[in-house]
Amino acid sequence: MNRSNVHLLDLPNEILLTILKKLNNMDVLYSLLDVNDGQLDILAQEKTFTNVLDFGHTDNISLIDRFCIYILPRICHNIEYFILEPVFMERILLAAVYPNLAELKLFNFEQQIVSTYFTDELLLRSVFQQQITSLILVNDDKGAIIGSLNEYTRNIYVHILNFFKNLTHLNIIGPNIMLCPGLSLCDLPATTFSSKILTHLCIIVENFDDCLYLLDG
């Protein structure tokens, strides 16, 4: 019986896609996009690999460099959801224009991120205010250093709700429920934390009365 040598690139695109879908999409993009093979390059740009990009928990500078310089500008129109670390957020979001970006998840969120990035002076303002409809913050602020919970609520939680003008989904979670600052509304005006368009809210509250305040709002 004669053996025929079948190479990976001899396979139909449908089979190649099935194989590639079993891999991490970030690995597919990093390894195959912008390589000297038109077939793999085109396949790597499929939406299944480009609509959600997870840069969370990475400190690989060479990976960030390659994505920002070569990859993101080519797939920017497909990206709908970014998962990011604050240290790389500005660079990644400024690497291209993302017309379909609507969801953002941010790890290691701390209160100084609000004053640094969620401001009217930043170039990213239009992305945050006009495009983002779903925001997930993994809050890493420690209770011992935040001071008054009412003050934290006003300066952080209320500011976020007001700054992201098209937000319909807001999740603020913590790596540990005991370490995440709770929303504290009891001594604040009833309309302090309110939105006409927010339909989904997941947040830790300081006590049951704060939950009632939310329901009344």
Model regions and ranges:
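Eukaryote-biased activation of long, low-complexity terminal tails and linkers
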Residues: 1-217
